[in-house]
């Protein structure tokens, strides 16, 4: 089955789940009894409004609204395209991401935004970009037509989410797809099972862009700074707590790779594990400002957006290492931001070194790490066993933090990871350079 057909089928599933109000993720099986958590998989590719020629060659057939004269092609046509985008369930309704040609163009827009009926939710001159909310599409179209030459590109605020874990193949339903669980042995595969790691991560801030981190015994001695960008007042999804524990947990079986790390908890996704690229890009920039040296993003979207790409490239330019989950959709392409060259993308393997059946693969995959049956902390003080590229990414972020604290320069870390990776003989599209191991 090709990737496009998989996307189409998955979109149908997503729309059904949206209509039933059962969005969620299935990356964890709790060790306590409870209702099964629903699945939220990637939706079909969205036609993002951006220039026809994207920097990585993708999106050549996408609707173009940005290039000055193209924006001015017709108010009615533009209005129709905005309406079609706003009707999609794969975007935040009544929001748009605007990219400008210069800081001056962005500054001028901010001065006239209110008059144009636009609420600026966030803007940053480093990316020459703004996230806006609108109530009247006609007034937004007026702004775009009148000031078209100021814009580099525009597009919807695309949804991004915690990757769900698909059901295993029917023939292997009784043994989790035929995969061998790590449980508490994940660190042993990394080559650090009996090593004194108590100072690993010391002096290193790791930003966790996720669903938020809550109090847990495994994190009670870890310095955690909380930044809530969602601000919805809802309970936190336990996924973020799990990722933080895999990076810096200090308690027995929920122990992390680099327990001396400081965690910067950027909440960019809600209780259902759902966020948007506008918030994630904002979180990346604020994490850089806060002194993060590593950014873990165990979230993904199938849609390549210029704002998210620019944010990770900015982080890289500042010497910050971004690590992201490859995705759990069994596809031959990576989710974003893992799909960007500036990101250390991570696939999942089981305890026998085999690629997990759910793990995405594709060109540019950097490395693989334990991602099947991983023990971690969870909300409300619970311990869970979960599977996914989310866990693999978090373990890799912990490894990066450990290397930085051991005085490896950030520019050398990718090379160190590839040189020390365990070669399995599997194609690079499945495991990248191999399975993560630390020197």
Predicted regions, residues:
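C-terminal subdomain of the subtilisin-like protease fold in secreted/lumenal serine endopeptidases
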Residues: 5, 37-40, 45-46, 288-297, ...
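Primarily auto-inhibitory N-terminal propeptides
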Residues: 6-172
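Protease zymogen maturation seam
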Residues: 149-205, 217-218, 430-432
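Subtilisin-like serine protease catalytic core
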Residues: 194-206, 211-225, 231-278, 340-342, ...
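Short pre-catalytic strand/loop immediately N-terminal to key active-site residues, enriched for Gly-Thr
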Residues: 227-236, 355, 379-391
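Substrate-binding/charge-relay-adjacent region of secreted/lumenal peptidase catalytic domains
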Residues: 245, 274-294
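Hydrolase catalytic cores
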Residues: 246-247, 268-269, 371-436
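Catalytic-core segments of hydrolase enzymes
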Residues: 292-379, 416-421
């Amino acid at each position: 089955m090709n990737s496009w057909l998989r996307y189409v089928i998955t979109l149908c599933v997503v729309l059904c789940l949206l209509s039933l109000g059962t969005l969620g993720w299935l990356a964890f099986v709790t060790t306590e009894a409870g209702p099964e958590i629903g699945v939220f998989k990637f939706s079909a590719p969205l036609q993002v409004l951006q220039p026809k020629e994207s920097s990585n060659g993708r999106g050549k057939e996408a609707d173009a609204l940005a290039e000055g004269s193209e924006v001015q092609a017709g108010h009615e046509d533009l209005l129709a395209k905005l309406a079609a985008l706003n009707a999609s369930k794969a975007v935040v309704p009544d929001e748009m991401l605007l990219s400008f040609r210069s800081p001056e163009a962005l500054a001028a827009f901010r001065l006239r935004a209110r008059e144009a009926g636009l609420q600026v939710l966030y803007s940053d001159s480093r990316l020459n970009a703004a996230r806006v909310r609108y109530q009247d599409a006609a007034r937004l179209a007026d702004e775009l037509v009148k000031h078209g030459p100021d814009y580099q590109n525009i597009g919807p605020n695309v949804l991004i989410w915690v990757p769900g874990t698909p059901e295993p193949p029917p023939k292997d339903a009784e043994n989790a797809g035929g995969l061998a669980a790590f449980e508490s042995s994940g660190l042993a595969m990394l080559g650090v099972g009996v090593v004194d790691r108590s100072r690993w991560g010391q002096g290193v801030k790791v930003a966790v862009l996720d669903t938020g981190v809550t109090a847990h015994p495994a994190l009670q001695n870890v310095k955690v700074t909380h930044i809530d960008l969602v601000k919805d007042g809802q309970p936190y999804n336990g996924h973020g707590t799990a990722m933080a524990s895999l990076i810096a947990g200090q308690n027995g079986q929920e122990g992390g790779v680099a327990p001396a790390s400081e965690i910067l908890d950027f909440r960019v996704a809600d209780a259902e594990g759902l966020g948007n690229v506008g918030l994630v890009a904002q979180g990346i920039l604020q994490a850089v400002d806060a002194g993060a040296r590593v950014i873990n993003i165990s979230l993904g979207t199938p849609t390549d957006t210029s704002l998210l790409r620019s944010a990770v490239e900015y982080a890289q330019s500042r010497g910050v290492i971004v690590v992201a989950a490859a995705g759990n959709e069994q596809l031959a392409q990576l989710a974003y931001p893992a799909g960007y060259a500036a990101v250390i993308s991570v696939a999942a393997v089981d305890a026998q070194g085999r690629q997990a059946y759910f793990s995405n693969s594709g060109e540019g995959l950097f490395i693989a790490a334990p991602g099947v049956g991983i023990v971690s902390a969870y909300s409300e003080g619970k311990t869970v066993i979960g599977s996914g590229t989310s866990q693999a990414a978090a373990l890799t972020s912990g490894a990066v933090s450990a290397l930085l604290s051991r005085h490896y320069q950030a520019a050398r870390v990718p090379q160190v990871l590839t040189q020390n990776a365990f070669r399995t003989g599997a194609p690079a599209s499945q495991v990248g350079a191999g399975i993560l191991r630390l020197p």
